[in-house]
Amino acid sequence: TLDAFTEKELAGNVINLVGLLFMIGWLSALAILGKELKENGAALGSVASLVFTAVLAILAVSLGLSLGANDLFAEGNKAAAVTLELASESAWYGFPQLLGVGYTLLGLGLVLERNPLPRVLAGLFVLAGVATFILAPINDGLGFLLFLISILLVITSGIFLLRQGN
């Protein structure tokens, strides 16, 4: 990873920046949705919002460590760069579990709220959260598939909420 990034530093930085912006928007939207729950699901929504904020912190720490590793590698300090990159990758290990907890809590809050999303869509948040929490650490490919499904769930929910606002 470090060799590839050093050879194509501009492309790597662009990919990191676009990915970072995407993930900040996605996690912020989930945190805001959790905070918007006002009735029966308010407590679960608030806790989900905190969990999504923690997931965002994992992203920031991991990216910072990885960028530091790339700088050290470019300076020729390969041993320290590899150590930092391993720490960056290790920070990601908690990502699927926290993400699954966040989705589950948000989904339960949405089910209890009965608005703004239909119960089926809210229930899919719960299902995606439980599946991500349990299955993502077992199999990387399955974890990534669950991640993509959860992104589609968020997009679908966003479209539904935007149409409902009109």
Predicted segments with their positions:
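Hydrophobic, aromatic-enriched alpha-helical segments typical of multi-pass transmembrane helices
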Residues: 1-166
